[in-house]
Amino acid sequence: MQTRKTLSWIKEEITRSISVSLMIYIITGAYISNAYPIFAQQGYENPREATGRIVCANCHLANKPVGIEVPQAVLPDTVFEAVVRIPYDMQLKQVLANGKKGALNVGAVLILPEGFELAPPDRISPEMKEKIGNLSFQSYRPAKKNILVIGPVPGQKYSEITFPILSPDPAAKKDTHFLKYPIYVGGNRGRGQIYPDGSKSNNTVYNATAAGIVSKIIRKEKGGYEITITDAPEGRQVIDSIPPGPELLVSEGESIKLDQPLTSNPNVGGFGQGDAEIVLQDPLRVQGLLFFLASVILAQIFLVLKKKQFEKVQLSEMNF
């Protein structure tokens, strides 16, 4: 009897532990998966400004390359791949929010023409699903299905991101046409330097807010520094707070100027944007082109046969 009660108690404890762990995973997982898109989604109605600049560059200040590969042309109602490449040195480590070093994450925003959208799961081939992996894409806005975002995701695994895209059918969507369309992409690796509210992250350089002498440097218990700058003529003191992460470049007694860097710049990531073009091809135009090419080939064949027949007639007349 006692053994049965003990086993029952152990079973309840295990069930409770699993439930708590699952809740923590869901909460933290949701936060991580929404961290990159929510920054832009909360602050901007459209991720691409009128100047062509993608708004992610407002927080990720360093300029880095990004690449995109799409088919030259696609037929209506067809699933195709848009491959975004975010290259960087896999050996690099970035400063995390707690000041420690860790691996870089990546994220991307893909701005498609109106009518193009994320392909439904039942339209994606097994080969394409294998390329996509465990990535979960989402629309920038419920009404903007042509703008897709992803991230942050581990950069070492997803420096190349495959988006499954469904092309529109002008026969069903009257506002789409058989034309050449632009596609815009933005991709970042690593954390940003500025938060959406304008405040600095710990992944950037910190400058002196006043000129004077560094009279005191206090190392905080949780990391970072408090630097006291004393203005010699007036004796006014200014305290600059440095979060954990950046390395200190100044020492006590040193004379510094306004806006002089107090720390190194720990940022190893950056943001880049690019574009590509894709043609929504009319199937009738393709069929017409094939018919034209076939007719040209047949005409050439008949011309050769006619020429040989004429040569035979000439040869027979000469022999006669």
Curated annotation (Swiss-Prot):
Cofactor entry: heme
Cofactor details (free text): Binds 1 heme group covalently.
Location in or out of the cell: Plastid, Chloroplast thylakoid membrane
Annotated heme binding sites: 36, 56, 59-60
Main localization category: plastid
Residue spans crossing the bilayer: 286-306
Pfam families registered for this protein in UniProt: Apocytochr_F_C, Apocytochr_F_N
Domain of life of the source: Eukaryota
Membrane topology of this protein: Single-pass membrane protein
GO annotations of cellular component type: chloroplast thylakoid membrane
Record keywords, A-Z: Chloroplast, Electron transport, Heme, Iron, Membrane, Metal-binding, Photosynthesis, Plastid, Signal, Thylakoid, Transmembrane, Transmembrane helix, Transport
Sections of the chain in a coiled coil: none
Keyword Nucleotide-binding among record annotations: no
A GO BP entry: photosynthesis
Segment forming the signal sequence: 1-35
Assembly, per entry: The 4 large subunits of the cytochrome b6-f complex are cytochrome b6, subunit IV (17 kDa polypeptide, petD), cytochrome f and the Rieske protein, while the 4 small subunits are PetG, PetL, PetM and PetN. The complex functions as a dimer.
Family: Belongs to the cytochrome f family.
HAMAP family documented for this protein: Cytb6_f_cytF (MF_00610)
Free-text function comment from the UniProt entry: Component of the cytochrome b6-f complex, which mediates electron transfer between photosystem II (PSII) and photosystem I (PSI), cyclic electron flow around PSI, and state transitions.
Protein name: Cytochrome f
